[in-house]
């Protein structure tokens, strides 16, 4: 009888300890789940800051190279450029880095995709029109929507092999490059139009004097 009571108490003790350990384990797991959500929120916030920095730099650069900037006095342009350079300098002081965890295959895919884009960018000065068409096909390869033009199937398979965060960064880089090309095209057309108007004005003036 005494032995039975001792055994029962020992069994009860083991049960209590086991139940207590399970509760602790459950609480710890719940805490880690909550921390994981906060970690992902932190990464998302840092990525958003990183993107905002890129957008700000692009906007400042766009203003400095805008047609409006060419059509003001030298003194005003110098003053505005000083302000733009100051803003750019302050923007560059913000350092944000979100490292992406990659396996060797994803690392290689990212290098391959980056190399392809860099090769297209290097041809901007030689043939901007062809480079833009090539960039459009690369961008279409990254789009989940029905592309308006041809898709670079080889590039698409390479991008699919990249980490998800890298896929988003590749798409953003292509968007930025295409916007810069469009802005350059507009600036060139406006400049040519201004030159053409100036040339006609001079011809009319010459005609009057003749």
From Swiss-Prot:
Coiled coil residues, start to end: 20-60
Record GO cellular component, one term: dendrite
Annotated BAG domain residues: 109-189
Molecular functions per Gene Ontology: adenyl-nucleotide exchange factor activity; heat shock protein binding; identical protein binding; protein-folding chaperone binding; tau protein binding; transmembrane transporter binding; ubiquitin protein ligase binding
InterPro entries: BAG2, BAG_domain
Post-translational modification N-acetylalanine, affected residues: 2
A GO biological-process term: positive regulation of protein processing
The entry's keywords: Acetylation, Chaperone, Coiled coil, Phosphoprotein
PROSITE patterns to which the protein is assigned, alphabetical: BAG
Function: Co-chaperone for HSP70 and HSC70 chaperone proteins. Acts as a nucleotide-exchange factor (NEF) promoting the release of ADP from the HSP70 and HSC70 proteins thereby triggering client/substrate protein release.
Known partners and oligomeric status: Binds to the ATPase domain of HSP/HSC70 chaperones. May interact with NWD1. Interacts with HSPA1A (via NBD), HSPA1B (via NBD) and HSPA8. May interact with DNJC9; the interaction seems to be histone-dependent.
Protein name as it appears in the record: BAG family molecular chaperone regulator 2
Annotated organism of origin: Mus musculus (Mouse)
